[in-house]
Amino acid sequence: MKRFWFLFFLPLSLAAQDTLLIEGRTFVDTLSGTSYGVTVNRTRPVKFIFRNNSVTGENTVGYMLEAGQENVTQYTNNFRGAEITGNKFTWVGDQNANTITHGVFTGYHTDVRVMYNYLDYVPMGIIRKSNGMTDSTGVVAYNIIRNPPAVGVVVKGMNGVRIYNNTFYSEDSLYVGPGIGTWRGLIDIYENDNPVGSAKGAKIKNNIFYTKSQLTNINVMNESCLDGFESDYNIFWCESGEPMFMIAGSRLTFTQWRARGYDLHSMVVNPYFINTVDLVPERRMQWGTPTEFNYGIAASDYWEAGFYPTLVRQGEYWQQGARVYEGDIVIFYWRGKLFDGDTTAIDLKYGKIVINQGEIHIQQ
């Protein structure tokens, strides 16, 4: 097994506000079997920040960033309030649906903020796990999760997890046999069975879900997880038919999902990504709902170790997905007519149309 160990020898009087910062580093793990990847010492309570790093791996078992535990230990919640932001995680191993490599793992720590990251082919992308602990200020927001062989985000036995303004994109197929396709959702929510822990009150808003096949977008595995569950103001698109969902093992179409009371304000619309790497919508997707997390990734930005992504503030009309367009929409024209009903009111020679927060301004 290969591990990247970070050992910080801290005084016995260490305070909870002390900071453990890993920033601007490049990690490449070439072990293809079991590897624990970037493993961080969690024996003391600290403010853990993992920022603007690049992590590449090909391990089929283990982690890319191990910043949590699989069970209750004496180190539980030592990383409460951790921040994992602006990183790029790239997995280059065998594209097999049986691969269980955990990308960003923060088990048994609450209020963790996982934001502005790019995950490329990471088998199990972002894992929020516990024995029924409750998240109150944490969030999974403004991440791009591209082509996860298994699942994009997992909520296992943790209450109150918020999943806002992420972009999910998958070219995968449905599971047809061992190692081929995935049976999981882009988001999986389920109880922890050992030790038993609930996963209530998850909130899924302002995300973009794009699939080539009729994969499951949101998979709520236990009926009990619907207690306090909310999903709305999202964008869904499937190239092969109606977007699909699952509750307690039953597959549901978008129509059936909405009949259960979910995603009533969401839309099925193609975001027309400019390309399938940067995942920038061709136009603004701005039918979202405001949250406290009001900065997204600039449409023109990219990830590089040591550099923080450029962030753009949301406007009055909330944009969905991880990318946020800056400024007004401007359309230049050469000749035109302005109509009032069926009557031509004004001949337009040349100028521009500026669309700002729903208001249209014609400038000549």
What are these regions (language model features)?
Residues Q17-T30, R44-N59, E70-Q95, H102-F105, ...:
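Right-handed parallel beta-helix
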Residues F6-A16:
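Hydrophobic h-region of N-terminal signal peptides that target proteins for export
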Residues M1-R3:
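Positively charged n-region of N-terminal signal peptides that target proteins for export
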Residues K212-Q214, F236-P243, I297-S300:
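Acidic glycine-/aspartate-rich tracts in secreted/extracellular proteins
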Residues Q256-F332:
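C-terminal accessory segments
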Residues G33-T39, V61-M64, Q95-N96, T101-G103, ...:
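Structural detector of coil-to-beta-strand junctions
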Residues V38-V40, Q69-Q74, I189-P195:
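Short, recurring structural edge motifs at helix starts
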Residues R25, Y262, F332-D347, G351-Q364:
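Extracellular beta-strand-rich, repetitive "passenger/adhesive" scaffolds
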